[in-house]
Curated annotation (Swiss-Prot):
Pfam families: AMP-binding, AMP-binding_C, Condensation, PP-binding. Residues 965-1039 form the Carrier domain. Gene3D superfamilies: 3.30.300.30, ACP-like, Chloramphenicol acetyltransferase-like domain, N-terminal domain of ligase-like, Nonribosomal peptide synthetase, condensation domain. Pathway: Siderophore biosynthesis; anguibactin biosynthesis. Changing V852K: Does not produce anguibactin, impairs ability to grow under iron-limited conditions and decreases virulence. This is Anguibactin system regulator. GO terms for molecular function: DNA binding; ligase activity; phosphopantetheine binding. Changing I859P: Does not produce anguibactin, impairs ability to grow under iron-limited conditions and decreases virulence. Induction: AngR transcription is regulated by iron.
Length: 1048
């Protein structure tokens, strides 16, 4: 390799890097310990009819002219300038006689080698000799040392030398050394603890929270993709003219279009953007790194582009002229320690070379890579046209996402550069057209006509055609269609005698059984509205619902002792008496659009809210499912869901409308897989419909006890919570041809609104997707500003169509807040988060508010907090849901100062739970109670919920706070079984199986061991009596009376 000596003597042997260079280099090294990534700018230019010798001579002249090219970047964060440096002879690849496909491959290989190189050389140059006397020049600059304007200067000076003009002499006083020392001295004067500096940092929003598919640190190597937008000279001048008319710079106009696009894909109104600003007025003609990054909080959405761009101009000027210099290196370090939202600060950049720059020559190819930049936009003028260079690390993002962002940017840029455009008009939608088209198509699928029938009508039609078919099986009892209809008509007659009129609300408060189905059919036949109110909640809460719903008559079971009235406001009618009444001869005439039922769900203010669903809304869902899966007279469903849980609506009316059979279990058997398996096998159940946790329990039990029950199920429908990725295969291990269906929706949208037939589960899936809307239902994914989110962007799921509830009963304010009417379409805001995949598939991403799903029940944490705060002595309480797959509730309590448990312990966890049981259903009472002196707070002064979650994994004063030792032989027997299953752990009388680490799998193993020891324990008993003390008593009773369910 021939070498030429570099004659330029630099005045210093080494030079400290600037803060910006330190940041770039340190970030690069953080990501290059095991990865292939460096900071560089790479350009390719073609030169025609110029000899190679001439080109080499001119390049050598430029390199000798600029001392930076003689430097070496070392590991000590200094630039070293050897006394004698050398210029390597440029590599040459002769392709002058190669075929086109070979040339294309060689050029691609060259680019790949150059861009993936980990060389720290300041400049690397090679030639490709192409046919037709063309030389392709490949130049790679180390961008830690050479900035974008310097790259431009390099090629301008090459053009100057090739034209025969000499280079100007460098100013020996304005050098790189002078610049670096000046910047570093300025940094020394910055007080990083000053209030003004911290004020600036803390007011910055996060960078655009773009969807990603991996963390940058996990990339094996980085490929940079450059995409370019070109705006004609005419349109560019129009954009400049309009910008100046509104007193904004063209740079801020281009950056504001960028922030608008980033805002949509980042699901945020405000975002941080890094402007790479080069201050070179005093350093003209010098190649080096003069970039001073500036972090600016940009607006991404306003009512018009004019208000947005003017706002951003103001924000930029405030940041630029801020009275305290804000070094980016220190900014980034501080931001990354504030919160997770700043985990990757300053990773999106905007830069420009629009002033006094017009590249006479256009680059053939190029790209720019920085370890701390995921996406950059660089604006330049080439041959009088605006060229916008988008450089992105595509491997970080979902496929084609950056391309879609580029198209939206192009569309908005084209619109704003039109002649006579009005920037004060509302911003147009930027959702890519192809995405909009796919969503419109899937939201209009299906040919299902809106039903004009009532929810119960098809059942009574089936009575006429198949009167002797089995309608219900419950243990040894069964009812055929005609008998069930007879009971329902008599019940309707009894309700009429009790004064119930069409449109009245009638409560159903009884345990699971035949009576529930008789009751709801009878209520609907009488033209009334059924309101299921669970017995598994305090009487005070039940009566609050009765009063709120305007209920006078309550259908009960004669054996339910909990239904003793506390006053004479309500008339209690047991269904066994009701079916002995004179039957109602013909059904009450009701419009299909009128309410069929009201289901009360948890309310954030502490008061449950009643969801009002119409006949046609609910029946439309039932018909859609029945048609899709060909549900018919030979189908039987195991009905596990409680009546106040809307899966029961399909269990009852879906099957009875199709002529099928409902197989019931008792209230105590609803959590007992032994009973489920027996019912499935004995009664040939073909369908399963439940929350995922119950089906998981069925499969686990079947595997442990060698049951064939899952193989009987031709159709499994799961909804109401996350579905484990392993469930489809575990099910198909029993039945290869079984249909596994994932569903979702909201009580406010008639049972379900979406469906997905799960065939295979790809490795890359994070969860089972929601799928697609059911016929006559629609979905939108919407951000906080009401914009439809692009593919992969998380937003709130809105449901539209014929299943939408009529609102919340007697609560106009809540109805208006959740049910929106836009352009003639009704939408329900679910509070669930989701995103679209490019093919139109919906993915569920969890809740956005304080509402959670626990055991399939939708729970407002706010309602639990209201109940906790009602307890005397509680200063403040916070409830959270803990866990991913199997969530449990935990509550944190700060007592009034004079009643803090640390001092006087006036309350313990068990007392809190007893008090909550008087206000809330059992499933809403937290299993874990933790007392605190104060709540942990975030930097913004809010309760730190993540810190609370971490506390649940540490030993605190919890529901096991009173650790009474195990003393009886029975308790010791239980403790040994638990230790065998859970592993060695310290157990006490009050130790809770599930809080001690137990789950559904462990619970089944406990039951299995109990059976081997001669105790006929049911799984439901462990769920019901989950402490050592309670379970020991139950075990003893089961030993004495194995055929009976013992009661404490």
């Amino acid at each position: 390799m021939n070498q030429n000596e570099h004659p330029f003597a630099f005045p210093e042997t080494k030079l400290p890097l600037t803060s910006n260079q330190n940041w770039q280099l340190s970030t690069q090294r953080q990501r290059t310990e095991k990865k292939s990534i460096t900071n560089f700018t790479y350009q390719e230019f073609d030169y025609e009819n110029i000899s190679r010798d001439t080109l080499e001579r001119c390049l050598t002249t430029i390199i000798k002219h600029h001392p930076i090219f003689g430097a070496k970047l070392s590991d000590d964060f200094y630039l070293h300038f050897p006394s004698k440096t050398h210029i390597e002879t440029f590599a040459v690849n002769d392709l002058s006689n190669a075929l086109k496909q070979d040339i294309d491959k060689q050029l691609a290989d060259t680019r790949s080698a150059v861009t993936k190189s980990r060389s720290q050389a300041i400049i690397s140059i090679m030639f490709s000799i192409l046919p037709k006397n063309i030389i392709r020049l490949h130049v790679r600059f180390n961008s830690v040392v050479v900035d974008n304007p310097s790259v431009t200067l390099f090629f301008e000076q090459l053009t100057q030398l090739l034209s025969g003009s000499p280079l100007s002499f460098l100013n020996q006083e304005q050098t790189i050394s002078a610049y670096n020392h000046k910047v570093n001295n300025e940094l020394l004067s910055v007080d990083l603890e000053s209030a003004r500096w911290n004020e600036y940092i803390l007011t910055l929003p996060s960078s655009a929270n773009l969807p990603t598919i991996c963390e940058p640190e996990k990339l094996d190597e980085t490929d940079i993709t450059r995409r370019c937008i070109t705006l004609s000279q005419r349109k560019w001048q129009q954009l400049v003219t309009v910008s100046k008319k509104h007193n904004v710079t063209p740079e801020i106009t281009l950056a504001s279009i960028f922030s608008t696009v980033l805002s949509l894909w980042g699901h945020q109104k405000y975002l941080m953007m890094r402007f790479d600003i080069t201050k070179i007025n005093d350093y003209t003609g010098i190649i080096g790194q003069f970039t001073e990054p500036l972090l600016v909080g940009m607006s991404g959405f306003e009512q018009s582009f004019l208000s947005l761009v003017k706002n951003n101009q103001k924000k930029f000027e405030e940041a630029y002229h801020y009275d305290v210099k804000v070094p980016v290196f220190q900014c980034v370090n501080k931001l990354s320690n504030i919160s997770d939202s700043h985990r990757y600060p300053a990773n999106i950049t905007f830069s420009s070379e629009l002033l006094n720059t017009n590249h006479s020559k256009k680059a053939v190819w190029g790209c720019r890579q920085s370890a701390n930049t995921w996406l950059s936009l660089h604006a330049v003028i080439e041959q009088e046209q605006l060229v916008l260079q988008w450089d992105s690390q595509d491997a970080i993002f979902p496929k084609d996402m950056i391309k879609d962002m580029l198209h939206s940017y192009t569309d908005l840029l084209d619109l704003l550069s039109q002649k006579d455009v009005n920037w004060a008009q509302p911003l147009p939608t930027l959702l890519p057209k192809h995405q909009e088209s796919i969503r419109n198509k899937i939201n209009q699928q299906g040919d299902l006509e809106l039903t004009k029938e009532l929810l119960h009508q098809r059942f009574f039609k089936n009575v006429e055609s198949t009167p002797n078919a089995l309608a219900i099986i419950h243990g040894q009892e069964s009812l055929d269609y005609i008998t069930l209809a007879s009971y329902a008509k008599s019940c309707a007659g009894a309700l009429t005698e009790a004064g119930v009129k069409s449109g009245d609300r009638v409560a159903v408060t009884m345990n699971k059984g035949i009576g529930q189905i008789v009751a709801v059919l009878g209520i609907l036949y009488a033209g009334a509205i059924y309101v299921p109110v669970s017995l598994d909640q305090p009487q005070e809460r039940r009566e609050s619902i009765y009063q709120g719903a305007g209920i006078n008559v309550i259908l009960i079971n004669e054996s339910d002792s909990k239904n003793s009235p506390s006053n004479d406001l309500f008339f209690f009618l047991d269904w066994q008496t009701a079916i002995k009444s004179e039957p109602m001869r013909s059904p009450q005439d009701v419009a299909p659009s009128q309410p069929a039922y009201i289901i009360y769900t948890s309310g954030s203010t502490g008061t449950p809210k009643g969801v009002v669903i119409s006949h046609q809304g609910a029946l439309n869902t039932c018909i859609a499912i029945n048609r899709r899966y060909q549900i018919g007279k030979n189908d039987r469903v195991l009905a596990l869901s409680a009546l106040h849980f809307d899966l029961s609506v399909y269990d009852i009316f879906g099957l009875l409308s199709a002529g099928g059979t409902i197989v019931l279990v008792s209230e105590l058997e609803r959590r007992d897989p032994i009973a489920w398996c027996q019912a499935i096998e004995e009664h040939n159940v073909t369908m399963w419909n439940s929350v995922p946790a119950l089906f998981d329990m069925l499969l686990t039990y079947a595997t442990c006890f060698n049951s064939i029950a899952p193989s009987k199920l031709r159709l499994t429908m799961l909804s109401g919570d996350w579905i484990g990725l392993d469930l489809p295969q575990r099910y198909r291990n029993y039945r290869v041809d079984g249909q596994f269906i994932a569903m979702g929706g909201a009580t406010e949208a008639s049972i379900w609104s979406n469906v997905f037939d799960v065939e295979k589960v790809p490795m890359e899936w994070r969860s089972i997707p929601y799928g697609y809307p059911l016929p006559r239902q629609q979905y939108r994914v919407v951000d906080d500003l009401g914009r439809d989110c692009p593919d992969w962007v998380a937003g709130e799921l809105w449901i539209g169509g014929d299943g939408i509830a009529l609102g919340y009963f007697d609560d106009e304010l809540k109805t208006q807040a959740q049910f929106l009417h836009i352009d003639g379409h009704a939408w329900y805001r679910t509070g669930d988060m989701g995103c679209y995949w490019p093919d139109g598939t919906l993915e569920f991403l969890g809740r956005r508010d304080k509402q959670v799903k626990v055991g399939g029940y939708r729970i407002e944490l706010g309602e639990i907090e209201v109940a906790l705060n009602n307890i005397p002595g509680v200063q403040r309480a916070v409830a959270i849901a803990v866990g991913n797959k199997d969530k449990t509730l935990a509550a944190f309590i700060v007592m009034d100062s004079e009643q803090a448990p640390i001092v006087t312990a006036p309350l313990d966890a068990e007392e809190v739970q007893l008090l909550l049981n008087k206000q809330l259903p059992n499933y809403m009472v937290p299993k874990r109670i933790i007392f605190l002196e104060t709540f942990p707070l975030t930097a913004n002064g809010k309760v730190d919920h993540k810190a609370l979650t971490r506390m649940t994994n540490r030993e605190k004063k919890t529901s096991q706070s009173i650790n009474k030792p195990i003393i009886t032989a029975s308790e010791d027997r239980v403790a040994k079984i638990w230790n065998d299953v859970l592993g060695p752990t310290e157990l006490y009388k009050s130790s809770d199986f599930f809080l001690s680490g137990g789950d559904a799998y462990n619970a089944i193993e406990v039951v299995k061991r109990c059976h081997k020891a001669g105790y006929l324990i049911k799984l439901s008993m462990l769920y019901r009596y989950s402490t050592i003390e309670a379970f020991a008593i139950i075990m003893d009773r089961c030993r004495l009376a194995p055929q009976e369910e013992a009661e404490l």
